[in-house]
């Protein structure tokens, strides 16, 4: 297994923000040319990132034959869209290195638990918007997620919201307009990839 750490920060990122990759070593004796890659976003209410939803989960995906990566994204005091842009940078990085890493570029999946599920789903609904590609100065095609795994995700900012997550995510942007924008069940569109959702 090849393990590396990559800088995926933007100007509002926290110092610890990074992507850790867990790539299955390529072997001529194994007939698999490329593998899917899962980018994991641990939960933590946008207050911290939970280690129990990081490496242990990544290793389970590796054991099942997937490449994996963990995004240790920026949380409070960082606000929307800092973590979203870090996830976009991570998808861009994986797709740019797909040939070298033996990743199937059409099977890059974002996964998230709890608030990390909100981040993964946010990426699923916002990846094609101009503010993402313009900020990274890349084409939208390279940012496209091919699927989502949403593990007990925070989704709604409405009646059943996990208020702490939205307080931490929005902080001084905590307005009705931004609550509506980040209530992801209201943002589903034709660009959203297929999702596996479990609770």
What are these regions (language model features)?
Residues 34-43:
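Short beta-strand element of the alpha/beta-hydrolase
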Residues 32, 50-69:
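Short amphipathic alpha-helix adjacent to the substrate-entry channel of hydrolases
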Residues 49-51, 70-105:
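Catalytic nucleophile-loop/oxyanion-hole region of alpha/beta-hydrolase
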Residues 191, 196-199:
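Short beta-strand/loop motif that positions the catalytic acidic residue
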Residues 183-192:
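Conserved serine/cysteine hydrolase catalytic core
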Residues 92-163, 179:
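Primarily recognizes the serine-hydrolase "nucleophile elbow" in alpha/beta-hydrolase
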Residues 25, 44, 67, 72-76, ...:
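Short beta-to-alpha linker loops that shape the active-site pocket of alpha/beta-hydrolase fold enzymes
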């Amino acid at each position: 297994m090849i393990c590396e750490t990559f800088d995926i920060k933007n100007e509002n990122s926290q110092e610890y923000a990074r992507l850790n990759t867990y790539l299955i070593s390529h072997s001529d004796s194994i007939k698999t040319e490329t593998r899917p890659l899962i980018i994991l976003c641990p939960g933590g209410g946008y207050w911290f990132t939970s280690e129990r939803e990081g490496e242990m989960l990544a290793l389970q995906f590796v054991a099942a034959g997937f490449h994996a990566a963990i995004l240790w994204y920026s949380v409070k005091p960082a606000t929307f869209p800092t973590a979203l842009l870090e996830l976009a940078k991570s998808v861009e990085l994986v797709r740019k290195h797909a040939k070298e890493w033996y990743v199937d570029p059409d099977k890059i999946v974002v996964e998230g638990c709890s608030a990390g599920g909100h981040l993964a789903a946010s990426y699923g609904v916002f990846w094609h918007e101009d503010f993402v590609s313009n900020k990274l100065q890349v084409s939208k095609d390279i940012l496209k997620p091919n699927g989502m795994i949403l593990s007990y995700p925070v989704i709604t900012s409405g009646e059943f919201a996990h208020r702490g997550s939205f307080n931490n995510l929005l902080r001084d942007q905590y307005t009705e307009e931004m609550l509506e924008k980040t209530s992801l069940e209201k943002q589903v569109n034709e660009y959203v990839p297929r999702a596996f959702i479990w609770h």
